[in-house]
Amino acid sequence: SLNFTYFSTLFNKRTIYSSSVIVEGSDQHFERVKGMLTGVMVLKGTAKTKMTVGLAVNIDPTAQVPVIPVFTYEHRFDNGLIADVTLPKSVYMRKYLFKNTGRVSLGAEMDQTTFYVYNIDGSNPDQRFQYRQLDINSGIIYEHAIGDFIITGKTGIKLTPSGRLFRKEDNFNDAVFEITPDP
């Protein structure tokens, strides 16, 4: 990807604009170019509390939601706990350990898995498909700094509320195969 960030002031508040051009593909083919534009305004920035609000614009013909509101909030409590909220991505409670070389986090985050599939039925070997699924990962994360490296361990539950296979040139809503959780 290629990224650009610009810092400015809007309504007397620090505002950060960023853009990204992302090239996507697989080990077999280049597949698509997509982009992301964001604008985030810092509403509060103190030693204990940081809060921002903004918009993210997804420039991708297969995007499920082209415009996404963004809200971040971080607060450091007196007991060492940190509330770390990045909506719509994640919600965590964090705590530094061992003289700030370790950190434990409890919470949840949304993630996406995507990959390309080729020659599914053999009738059209040039037809390309994209599989995309939404994952919600809930659990505990431990991170530990050793020199210049950070070792991470995760445990918890992964929920996949939706997954779809669609032709590369089609929209995410035009799925040829769909998975949903079975309650």
Annotate each language-model stretch with its function:
Residues 1, 31-35, 65-69, 87-89, ...:
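Residues that define the transmembrane beta-barrel architecture of outer-membrane proteins
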Residues 7, 25-29, 41, 59-61, ...:
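Outer-membrane beta-barrel proteins
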Residues 1-18, 22-27, 139:
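Transmembrane beta-barrel domains of Gram-negative outer membranes and organellar outer membranes
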Residues 11-17, 47-51, 79-81, 100-104, ...:
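Outer-envelope beta-barrel architecture signal
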Residues 7-9, 22-30, 44, 56-62, ...:
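Sequence/structural signature of outer-membrane beta-barrel proteins
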Residues 70, 87-173:
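Outer-membrane beta-barrel translocator/channel fold
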Residues 3, 16-22, 52-56, 72, ...:
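Transmembrane beta-strands of outer-membrane beta-barrel proteins
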Residues 2-8, 37-45, 55-57, 71-75, ...:
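Residues on the lipid-exposed face of transmembrane beta-strands in outer-membrane beta-barrel proteins
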